């Protein structure tokens, strides 16, 4: 049994809930303010996003709330994608209407209507999202500013899977994306054979800029490889050390990226006097001087270029108007990598999370 901090709620079944401590209640430091060891899926902490919006990337999955897809076992969270046809039948993809609007509140109601995210009608050339998966967030229940975050996780193995551990601003105080920032602690790909972009590799990125399309993520991005094998072979620990002066990102205690903007991110970007600075009233780390919440998800495919054209045997083009259909028609090529010799999709195709922990390191302000 894993260790737990004090004041964790003991449930009748013997499982322990995620624990949250208000930073102002810390009396010594480091002070753990969040811990989830996933003895069970705590829906009071983790909210399922319900949407087909594809993250603005025209990804191929629909995010749903289903215990065949997101579940816990042996103190581990699994996010394991499935085929929409296993839920609705193959004919539904090209002739059905998938309505995610819901009516019963959190966990049932659509959370993202952009990009036709709440309702879609399938046709022969424009099919409904062929995959279902899960995206969990702590937006309503836990967010933090400054401290240490650790996530111990194992990445999925399977062609065109796109796992991510990341953070978004709770209140978007500097405006719409990317003005209020995005913290991508890890993004990876499930492919065994995808050149230098397969599951042996991961990436860490900050997205920031005054407004789209000005996004200076290239200045705050690092790519790295697993010490041995791939990130789908075993568990690894991703860590963020976040202070009012800088950010440091580690994998298995090895520093991968340091972000120190100097005087400000505005000066770091070199924007000059021709634009208004949305972070002028913020601290040095603005837009990363505010509370962010946690997100865990497994996406699939997409046309934004995360899976570039011209590498391996990618079955769709990022410019194709029928990318969903092209991907689905090639399922005999990619689905075996998800099943790994089993009759159904293997748990090897799941992102597995052992724990998530957050500390305040020096004071409530650091």
Swiss-Prot record:
What tissues has this protein been observed in? Constitutively expressed in hemocytes.
Q: What induces it?
A: Not induced by injection with the beta-1,3-glucan curdlan or the shrimp pathogen V.harveyi.
Residues annotated as signal peptide: 1-17
Give a GO molecular function annotation for the protein.
hydrolase activity, hydrolyzing O-glycosyl compounds
Give glycosylation sites per the record: 66
Q: Which GO terms describe its biological process?
A: carbohydrate metabolic process; innate immune response
Which residue intervals define the domain GH16 in the entry?
18-364
Provide the alphabetized UniProt keywords: Glycoprotein, Immunity, Innate immunity, Secreted, Signal
Write down the InterPro entries for this protein, in alphabetical order: ConA-like_dom_sf, GH16, Glycosyl_Hydrlase_16
Q: What does the similarity note say?
A: Belongs to the glycosyl hydrolase 16 family.
Write the protein's name. Beta-1,3-glucan-binding protein
The species this protein belongs to is Penaeus monodon (Giant tiger prawn)
């Amino acid at each position: 049994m894993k260790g737990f901090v004090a004041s964790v709620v003991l449930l009748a079944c013997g499982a322990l809930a995620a624990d949250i401590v208000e930073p102002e209640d810390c009396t010594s430091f480091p002070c753990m303010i969040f811990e989830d060891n996933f003895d069970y899926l705590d829906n009071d902490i983790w909210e399922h996003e319900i949407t087909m919006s594809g993250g603005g990337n025209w990804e191929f999955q629909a995010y749903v709330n289903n215990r065949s897809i997101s579940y816990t076992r042996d103190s581990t969270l699994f996010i394991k994608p499935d085929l929409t046809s296993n839920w609705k039948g193959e004919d539904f993809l090209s002739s059905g209407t998938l309505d995610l609007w819901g009516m019963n509140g959190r966990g049932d109601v659509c959370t993202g209507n952009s990009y036709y995210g709440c309702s879609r009608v399938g046709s022969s050339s424009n099919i409904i999202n062929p995959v279902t998966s899960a995206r969990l967030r702590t937006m309503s229940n836990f967010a933090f500013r400054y401290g240490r975050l650790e996530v111990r996780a194992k990445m999925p193995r399977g062609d065109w899977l796109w796992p991510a551990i990341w953070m978004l601003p709770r209140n978007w105080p500097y405006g719409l994306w990317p003005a209020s920032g995005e913290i991508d602690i890890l993004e990876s790909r499930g492919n065994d054979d995808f050149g230098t972009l397969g599951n042996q590799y991961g990436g860490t990125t900050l997205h920031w800029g005054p407004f789209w399309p000005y996004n200076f993520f290239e200045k705050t991005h690092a790519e790295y490889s697993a010490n041995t094998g791939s990130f789908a072979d075993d568990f690894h620990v991703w860590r963020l050390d976040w202070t009012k002066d800088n950010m440091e990102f580690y994998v298995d205690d090895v520093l991968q990226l340091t972000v120190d903007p100097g005087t400000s991110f505005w000066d770091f970007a070199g924007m000059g006097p021709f634009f208004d600075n949305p972070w002028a009233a913020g601290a040095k780390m603005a837009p990363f001087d505010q509370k962010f919440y946690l997100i865990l998800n497994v996406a699939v495919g997409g046309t934004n270029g995360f899976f570039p054209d011209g590498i391996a045997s990618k079955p769709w083009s990022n410019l194709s108007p029928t990318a969903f259909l092209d991907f689905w028609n090639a399922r005999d090529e990619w689905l075996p990598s998800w099943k790994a010799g089993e009759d159904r999709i293997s748990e090897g195709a799941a992102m597995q999370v052992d724990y998530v922990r957050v500390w305040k390191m020096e004071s409530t302000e650091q």
